[in-house]
Amino acid sequence: MMKFLKQVGDYTKEAIQAGKYIGQGLSVTFDHMRRRPITVQYPYEKLILSERFRGRIHFEFDKCIACEVCVRVCPINLPVVDWEFNKETKKKKLNHYSIDFGVCIFCGNCVEYCPTNCLSMTEEYELSTYDRHELNYDNVALGRLPYKVTNDPMVTPLREFAYLPKGAIDPHDLPAGSRRAGLRPEEIVEQSQQ
């Protein structure tokens, strides 16, 4: 009889322990059920990108002086600049400019070092095609004005990180009552006015 009671007691302890483990696992599940969804319903919802987003390159043909700085600073020598020397004006005349976005790494060096600012990064990132040769943009395709996500009536623009659960990106701030190193811009202005 004692052996039977001991077995029942052991079984009860194991059942309680198993219930604890199941409860711990389900607590994680229920915790995630209370959070907001993390995914974005992509074709119908798009994130508003930051100003410094490096998307498709926009090219202004009239500003380009065919100096080929963009080719020299590109890590893979990607932009193709075709020009001819005009003997009358003694200047280069740009004939053709192209960038293959299938190869481009979107580093932004060409935009940064361009002396005439004829290149700029846009917020376009939807460059998918069925044929990789369609990713080779010539000066006409590069000159096409970029679109903005916020101007598309079929898309719900979402603020950056607004879709994340609350507390997911809370700043790691200083303890209450302590000061940051240095001065804030407002404090510098106040000091200069005094």
From Swiss-Prot:
* Disordered as annotated region, ranges: 173-194
**Binding of [4Fe-4S] cluster 2: at which residues?**
74, 104, 107, 110
Query: What residues bind [4Fe-4S] cluster 1, as annotated?
Result: 64, 67, 70, 114
Domain 4Fe-4S ferredoxin-type stretches: 55-84, 95-124
Q: Which GO terms describe its cellular component?
A: plasma membrane-derived thylakoid membrane
Tell me the keywords, alphabetical order. 4Fe-4S, Iron, Iron-sulfur, Membrane, Metal-binding, NAD, NADP, Plastoquinone, Quinone, Repeat, Thylakoid, Translocase
Quote the function comment for this protein. NDH-1 shuttles electrons from an unknown electron donor, via FMN and iron-sulfur (Fe-S) centers, to quinones in the respiratory and/or the photosynthetic chain. The immediate electron acceptor for the enzyme in this species is believed to be plastoquinone. Couples the redox reaction to proton translocation, and thus conserves the redox energy in a proton gradient.
This protein is called what?
A: NAD(P)H-quinone oxidoreductase subunit I
Q: Which organism is it from?
A: Leptolyngbya boryana
